A protein has these predicted regions:
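Sec-dependent N-terminal signal peptides
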Residues: 4-13
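N-terminal signal peptide c-region/cleavage motif recognized by signal peptidases
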Residues: 15-17
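Structured catalytic-domain cores with a bias toward divalent-metal coordination
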Residues: 20-153
C-alpha cells in the first residue's frame, strides 16, 4: 500500500488539464467543478450532472474531489471509461479513502465510473445509447451525444 501511495505522490506532481478551475477569493481558494464548489481542506463526494440529450437520455458521473488545504496542481484519476473495467473502479474507491485533504497540496479529482450508461448496460467498449466509445470521444462536445457530453465534462 505504501508503494501505491508513493506512486500517486509522484503522479501528483503532474498537472492535468480539466474543465475544473480554482476560483480565487480574497480569503481562500475555492475549487469549482461542474456546479460544485469546494473549500480548501474539504472533500466532496457526489455526482456531476451530464446534460440531457433530446430531453430523454441523461446521465451522471460519480466523483470524489479532495481539495487540499494548500494550493497546488490538479490530478484527475479516471476509472470506468469502458463499462466492463471493474478493477480500476474498485481501486479508485479504495484510493479515495486514503487521502486527507487537510494534508494535501493541490486537488485530486477521482472519477469512480466515467461511463455510467456503458457500466449499467455491461457493454465492453461502446455506450448503449449512441454506440460510441468514450475512450475515442475526447475532448467531447457540449451539445453532442451522451458519450460526447460525458467526454466534454
Amino acid at each position: 500500500m505504501k508503494k501505491v501511495l508513493i506512486i500517486f505522490i509522484y503522479l501528483f506532481l503532474i498537472s492535468v488539464n480539466t474543465h475544473a478551475e480554482e476560483k480565487q477569493s480574497s480569503s481562500n481558494n475555492l475549487f469549482e467543478i461542474g456546479d460544485v464548489i469546494i473549500s480548501p481542506g474539504e472533500t466532496y463526494r457526489g455526482n456531476l450532472k451530464v446534460s440531457k440529450v433530446n430531453d430523454a437520455i441523461e446521465s451522471f458521473i460519480p466523483i470524489t474531489v479532495h481539495h487540499g488545504a494548500n494550493p497546488g496542481p490538479v490530478l484527475s484519476l479516471i476509472a470506468g471509461i469502458h463499462g466492463s473495467e471493474y478493477s480500476p473502479i474498485l481501486a479508485m474507491q479504495e484510493f479515495a479513502k486514503l487521502i486527507d485533504p487537510s494534508q494535501l497540496n493541490g486537488t485530486v479529482i477521482i472519477v469512480h465510473i466515467a461511463n455510467i450508461p456503458a457500466f449499467a448496460a455491461r457493454t465492453i467498449y461502446i455506450g448503449p445509447n449512441d454506440l460510441k466509445n468514450l475512450n475515442r470521444s475526447f475532448p467531447g462536445k457540449v451539445n453532442g451525444t451522451i458519450t460526447e457530453r460525458i467526454a466534454y465534462i
